Amino acid sequence: MTLKPIRLRPEAELEIEEAFDYYLRESPRIAGRFLDEIASSLKKIQRDPQLYPAYTKNTRRRILGSFPFSVIYQEREEIILIVAIAHAKRREGYWTKRLKQ
């Protein structure tokens, strides 16, 4: 089975960086755990994109276990597009405009 490549929208990359920087100020260990959980989530999504429930706007969502974030993604023909790394406290659907770009 060939795995589809993962592509992150620039905004999703920025969300990871901002969260990492926040956790790094709190604790380098927590920041490392955050990155580990993101990496693990991306691997799980890549192995089985259909594993996580349908969300909105033709997306799926994987909720992180230890952090208040969700990975919002679309499975496309050639790739898996990571649309957002959405904090639970942000306005729901703030990322939908990214789907049109």
Feature-to-residue mapping (PLM):
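Enriched for short, Lys/Arg-rich terminal
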Residues: 1, 70, 74-101
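Arg/Lys-rich, positively charged N-terminal/basic patches that mediate binding to nucleic acids
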Residues: 1-35
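Short amphipathic alpha-helical/adjacent loop interface patches that line ligand
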Residues: 16, 20, 35-38, 42, ...
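Basic/aromatic recognition patch in beta-strand/loop cores that engages polyanionic ligands
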Residues: 40, 47-80
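Short, hydrophobic secondary-structure boundary micro-motifs
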Residues: 32-33, 53-55, 94
